[in-house]
Each structure stands twice: as structure tokens, then as C-alpha cells.
Curated annotation (Swiss-Prot):
Keyword Transferase carried by entry: yes
Name of the protein in its database record: Adenine phosphoribosyltransferase
Family: Belongs to the purine/pyrimidine phosphoribosyltransferase family.
Entry GO CC: cytoplasm
Top-rank taxon, per record: Bacteria
One GO term (biological process): adenine salvage
Pfam family, one: Pribosyltran
Function according to Swiss-Prot or TrEMBL: Catalyzes a salvage reaction resulting in the formation of AMP, that is energically less costly than de novo synthesis.
UniProt xrefs under InterPro entries: Ade_phspho_trans, PRibTrfase_dom, PRTase-like, UPRTase/APRTase
Gene Ontology MF term list: adenine binding; adenine phosphoribosyltransferase activity; AMP binding
Pathway(s) of this molecule: Purine metabolism; AMP biosynthesis via salvage pathway; AMP from adenine: step 1/1
CDD domains listed in its UniProt record: PRTases_typeI
Length: 187
């Protein structure tokens, strides 16, 4: 296991440097924060996972929940390293068993995510993981679903925060502690 101290820079700066900005994608005016270069580097992926593991190793967790879709990339790795279970929170219609659903607002319209109704039990301690916090809608929906099942949502975690979009402030105001590795200004 590589220690974060083996990274060539400060671990946070190292992760930040591996995130590519793609202007005007998927639409004009958007600065898309692409994590694929980070994932393509074994060293960067190890540093990222170690940051999450070091944060939660003593948190007495039962599960790491991952938000569809890019939260699925990191969350199961972190769950494995912590020897806890993984709970998928999926876009509607993707889970085969009985589910609970939660809708949230998008810029134009709504989206819905769901969780298996037996994904966790009352009192289970869970951290929600996603790649990025923008408006906070998906993470808030995940929080609401987990709490509806009786779980204790310990924290929300993401690689990137886009604080100018207000999602992290919204989540904190709703009582969800947050951990993000790095942040970028703007959209």
C-alpha cells in the first residue's frame, strides 16, 4: 500500500493536478471536471483511495454508498479497503429488487434515484461517495434515501467540490458534514 506521503506533491495538490478541465462540455459555458486522467494513473488512484481510507478507517462504518454513476468508481474501492459493504444508489429503473425512490430538481426538470429497500438497516453508519458536488441534488437525494431506511449518514464525500454552484453549502445547511479532496471555481 502506497502512503500518501509517497506522492510527488502534497496529496491534495497531486489529485487536483490529475483532474482535466474540458471547456464547453457537455454544453457551452460549462467547465467539465474530468476525473478520467486521475483514474488512469495507478499512483493517483492509490493516493485518492488512501485519502478516503485514512479519513474513515476509524469511523466505525457499516457501508460506503456510491452515487450513480461516477460514485460507483471510487466507492466500492474504498469500501473494500475499509472491509465494509457497498450500497449502490442508482438512477431509477436500474435496481432489480424492491426500492425506495427520491426525486430531486435539475436545472430543467427532475431526476430520480433509488436504493434497494433492504440496502441497510436502522443504525447502520454510512458515508455517501460521489465524484463531484455541484448543486448537491444527487447527494441530498442519497442522504434522504439512506435516512428513510434508518441509516446514520456520517458524511458525504467527493473528489471535487464546485462551491460556486452552491451544492456543498446546501448540503451542510441540511446537516450533512462533507469531505471533498479538492475544489474548482466556477461551473
Amino acid at each position: 500500500m502506497m502512503s500518501t506521503s509517497d506522492a510527488p506533491l502534497d496529496p491534495v495538490e497531486f489529485i487536483h493536478s490529475r483532474i482535466r478541465t474540458v471547456p464547453d462540455w457537455p454544453q457551452p459555458g460549462v467547465m467539465f471536471r474530468d476525473i478520467t486522467p486521475l483514474l488512469q494513473s495507478a499512483k493517483a488512484l492509490r493516493v485518492l483511495v488512501d485519502l478516503f481510507v485514512e479519513r474513515y478507517v476509524d469511523a466505525n462504518l457499516d457501508y460506503i454508498a456510491g452515487l450513480d454513476a461516477r460514485g460507483f468508481i471510487i466507492a466500492p474501492i474504498v469500501a473494500y479497503e475499509l472491509s465494509v459493504g457497498f450500497v449502490p444508489i442508482r438512477k431509477v429503473g436500474k435496481l432489480p429488487y424492491a426500492t425506495q425512490r427520491e426525486s430531486y430538481a435539475l436545472e430543467y426538470g427532475t431526476a430520480t434515484v433509488e436504493i434497494h429497500e433492504d440496502a441497510c438497516k436502522p443504525g447502520d453508519r454510512v458515508v455517501i461517495v460521489d465524484d463531484l458536488i455541484a448543486t448537491g441534488g444527487t447527494m441530498m437525494a442519497g442522504k434522504n434515501l439512506l435516512e428513510r431506511l434508518g441509516a446514520v449518514v456520517v458524511e458525504g464525500a467527493a473528489i471535487v467540490d464546485l462551491p460556486d454552484l452552491g451544492g456543498s453549502a446546501l448540503l451542510r445547511e441540511a446537516g450533512l458534514p462533507l469531505y471533498t479532496v479538492t475544489e474548482f471555481p466556477g461551473h
